[in-house]
């Protein structure tokens, strides 16, 4: 197996690379950002530049791809977000596929955002795809392109639709849990949209990495929801964070319709043979210690 991981310098890619090195699994990383890893294992390149990718001789031998590279943009300018998402998430993926002539297996990191507003809970993989933001739209388009491409090229495709992944340090604050932690740490009231009773099976980063490793050791094609073991409410999250920090910061409630978002992870358990280990309380405690 000759493995390539895109987005190797990102939060998930960085943690994955550490685990792979620990388990002595050989890999090649690709990222636009230079990091401090062994330079022999990293290709510094931009997936939006096909000509540059085609010059990379090491890519010709790759037969297994873990595609983590993605653009998550918090810009308020919808046009700018759209252009960047198309450029990186969609065009970048197409360029990547065109520069890897010997692919046999692909694992694509997608997102729960492809579903949009749940029609029912728990959400199965065959749920209608109606994303409510540009990031989700770009993931749906990329999924569909990969399905057509892989069918034509006879490549085994696996799609992981990750629930919100938490457990990173404070520089990663686009998810509810790190936002809540930052607020409570600074004695600021976190904002809760709705009544705070909405449930979601957040996924701790170590479990996300272990799910990828499990796939790597025994590849299974298909689409899988990858979510955590528990389904806490936002109020429960804030309570756990307060307890760990020995604080009593109360939230601000903003009236807004909210929905439970609970992924059905039965296929993950039955077919992938993977079960998340980190309970929400332990995950929150570990995350707080990183801030």
Model features per residue range: what roles?
Residues 3-23:
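N-terminal Rossmann NAD(P)H-binding glycine-rich loop of SDR-like oxidoreductase domains
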Residues 6, 30, 65-71, 106-112, ...:
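SDR active-site strand-loop-helix element
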Residues 47-88:
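NAD(P)H-binding glycine-rich loop region in Rossmannoid oxidoreductase-like domains
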Residues 67, 94-134:
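Conserved Rossmann-fold NAD(P)-dependent oxidoreductase catalytic core, especially the SDR/UDP-sugar
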Residues 110-111, 143-168:
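Conserved beta-loop-beta element that borders a ligand/cofactor-binding pocket
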Residues 115-116, 130-134, 158-175:
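Flexible, glycine-rich beta-alpha linker
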Residues 138-141:
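Active-site helix of classical SDR
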Residues 184, 188-291:
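C-terminal substrate-binding subdomain of Rossmann-fold SDR/epimerase-dehydratase oxidoreductases
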């Amino acid at each position: 197996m000759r493995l390539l991981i895109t987005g190797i310098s990102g939060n998930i890619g960085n943690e994955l690379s550490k685990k792979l090195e620990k388990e002595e699994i050989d890999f090649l990383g690709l990222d636009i950002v230079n990091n401090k890893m062994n330079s022999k294992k990293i290709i510094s390149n931009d997936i939006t530049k096909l000509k540059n990718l085609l010059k990379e001789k090491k890519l010709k031998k790759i037969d297994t791809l873990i595609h983590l590279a993605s653009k998550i943009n918090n810009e308020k300018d919808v046009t700018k977000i759209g252009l960047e998402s198309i450029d990186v998430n969609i065009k970048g993926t197409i360029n990547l596929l065109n520069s890897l002539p010997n692919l046999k297996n692909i694992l694509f990191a997608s997102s729960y955002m492809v579903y949009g507003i749940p029609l029912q809970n728990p959400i199965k993989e065959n749920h209608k795809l109606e994303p409510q933001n540009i990031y989700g739209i770009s993931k749906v388009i990329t999924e569909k392109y990969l399905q057509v491409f892989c069918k034509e090229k006879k490549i085994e495709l696996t799609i992981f639709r990750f629930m919100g992944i938490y457990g990173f340090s404070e520089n990663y604050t686009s998810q509810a849990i790190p936002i809540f932690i930052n607020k409570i740490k600074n004695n600021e009231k976190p904002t809760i949209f709705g009544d705070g009773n909405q449930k979601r099976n957040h996924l701790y980063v170590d479990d996300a990495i272990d799910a990828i490793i499990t796939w790597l050791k025994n590849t299974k094609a298909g689409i899988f929801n990858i979510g955590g073991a528990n389904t806490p409410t936002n109020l429960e999250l804030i309570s756990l964070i307060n307890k760990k920090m020995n604080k009593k910061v109360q939230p601000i409630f903003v009236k807004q319709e909210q929905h439970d978002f609970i992924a059905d992870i039965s296929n993950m358990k039955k077919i992938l043979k993977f079960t998340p280990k980190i309970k929400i309380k332990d995950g929150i405690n570990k995350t707080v210690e990183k801030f």
